[in-house]
Amino acid sequence: MASQKYILTEIKKGYNLSWYVCSQCYYAGTIKLYDDTGKVYFTCSKTSGGTSYQSLAQGHADFMGNELYLSVEIPQSTKIQQSITANNVTDAHAVKVGQVYGFCIEDSTDEDYNDFYIDVVGWAKKG
């Protein structure tokens, strides 16, 4: 079983979170977003085989922990690879108002990096 844990260091306590998860991988897998207090923001699983495109999760919440974690588990895989983008959300004056993370996950050897896609964004304020 392959698993990987990521620390989303640029999303700070009090940020308003939003996320989206989708998959077109053949293997089953589980994605979880949680914090250092034990609060789980979401857990989603792809349980069926096949490569049809599936939306697995979307939602939002306020982040009140100190560290935010994302875990990926793929039982049939021996190695998880990833391509990660991390960008600031800025206002019209180039002041940082949030953070975006995009995770493109590879579960096997074809290196297409489209097996799981996870988008997590946090804004310093909501509304």
Label for each model-derived stretch:
Residues D107-E111:
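Short, exposed beta-strand-loop hairpins at the edges of beta-sheets
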Residues D119-K126:
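Short beta-strand-to-coil "C-cap" segments at the C-terminal boundary of structured domains/repeats
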